[in-house]
């Protein structure tokens, strides 16, 4: 097996179902052993607003916004970030992302890979009420 992998994001299945946009979890498809990588495209007026927030037990997350503008809610603070912005989020920090803008927003989410994610995520309903 080669010491590298190359794939196109369009070759990674979209797991968003009927939800607008796309969520493509590339980790297994690229054969990553240490890094988790997800591509997310958020349609306008989508995300976690009016819904739940989440935190992790062990995973630090890094968001890199490729295009568009989103609101990131971190605990009680809402921060608007634009393309080219990188946001690091500690595991225990409650978080949610919302695309308020008129166009799609694209981001890459990076964290460390977990084999067993069964107890990793805690969700909090009503975190970002409308």
Region roles according to the model:
Residues 98-130:
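Double-stranded beta-helix
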Residues 62, 69-71, 78, 94, ...:
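Structural motif
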Residues 72-73, 89, 95-101:
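Short beta-strand His + acidic residue motifs that chelate non-heme Fe in jelly-roll/DSBH
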Residues 1-36, 43-44, 120-130:
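A short, N-terminal "cap"/entry segment at the start of jelly-roll beta-barrel domains
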Residues 27-36, 47-61:
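A short beta-loop-beta micro-motif enriched in histidine and acidic residues
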Residues 33-35, 43-48, 69, 113-117:
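Short, charged/polar surface micro-motifs in flexible loops or helix N-caps
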Residues 40-43, 55-72, 110:
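Short, conserved beta-strand element in jelly-roll/cupin
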Residues 76-91:
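Short acidic-glycine-tyrosine-enriched beta hairpin
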């Amino acid at each position: 097996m080669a010491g590298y992998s190359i794939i196109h994001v369009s070759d990674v299945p979209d797991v968003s179902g009927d939800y607008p946009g796309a969520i493509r979890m590339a980790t297994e498809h690229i054969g990553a052993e240490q890094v988790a990588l997800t591509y997310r495209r958020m349609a306008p007026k989508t995300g976690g607003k009016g819904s739940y927030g989440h935190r992790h037990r062990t995973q630090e997350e890094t968001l890199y916004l490729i295009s568009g503008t989103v609101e990131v809610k971190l605990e009680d603070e809402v921060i608007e970030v634009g393309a080219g912005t990188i946001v690091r989020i500690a595991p225990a920090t409650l978080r949610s992302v919302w695309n308020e803008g008129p166009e799609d927003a694209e981001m890459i989410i990076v964290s460390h890979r977990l084999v067993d994610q069964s107890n990793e995520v805690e969700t909090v309903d009503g975190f970002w009420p409308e």
